[in-house]
Amino acid sequence: MNNGSILNCVICAALFSLLAVGMAAAQQKNFTDDNFPAQGGDIKITFIGHGTLMIAYAGKVIHVDPVSMYADYATLPKADLILVTHEHGDHLDGKAIQAVTTSRTTLITNQASAKNLSGASVMQNGDTRTIDGITIDAVPAYNPDKQFHPKGNGNGYVLTLGGKRIFVAGDTENVPEIKALKDIDIAFLPMNLPFTMTPEQVADTAKAMKPKILYPYHFGETDTNELVRLMGGEKDIEVRIRDLK
């Protein structure tokens, strides 16, 4: 078996495991959320599961990596904006996207995801767009030394809304482009091996970018207590653990 076949087997096995967990999670109707005071009203972030979020602000709804295994999207609010970080099945789901899409929905993806979707607007690493007063910066998301997430393919996104900057990293490691980000109020950083970061790498990233609030997400069975321990000396960074396995 060649390296490419082995890689595909690893990814498929991981996604199958996530599907098994997610099918049960999707039956859950009540998701938790946090609210953040902002200019023009509160920002509400709802924690759907794994790498999937819903953000509401000033009457606008943003779905990030909507995936049916984590929620029944037919019951969730329609989207003004959908962001897809990359094309893996635990981040890209055409059925979920269709369920929350209307004629006024803007769908933003990376190039590889757009091949599987109609009506997608592509953002490349480094691109910036403003939609309905929300500024979106596409940030590189990749593994430097592994094939799971090649450089130049996936996006993380910095959203600027209500005077706040929210960073959703996508699947990445502690790469220089992310560590160089500044003035981040809320950061979602992935924490699971072999696809993204160890707790040590998440702590390294957070200590460099210094978000006011850090959420580990996409963390599977990784011990979140280890991250809390590693961040114990960072008095200006609040670590919040939510149900984002």
Model features per residue range: what roles?
Residues 63, 68-113, 182-188:
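Active-site metal-binding motif and surrounding structural segment of the metallo-beta-lactamase
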Residues 121-130, 203, 207-245:
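Binuclear metal-ion centers of metallo-dependent hydrolases, dominated by the metallo-beta-lactamase
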Residues 70-72, 88-92, 114-116, 127-129, ...:
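Active-site environment of divalent metal-dependent phosphoester hydrolases
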Residues 95-100, 177-180, 201-205, 227-230:
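A short acidic, amphipathic alpha-helical/loop segment
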Residues 1-13:
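Bacterial N-terminal signal peptides that target proteins for export
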Residues 27-77, 120-182, 242-245:
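Core dinuclear metal-dependent hydrolase active-site scaffold
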Residues 10-22:
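Bacterial N-terminal signal peptides
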Residues 158-209, 215-222:
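Metallo-beta-lactamase
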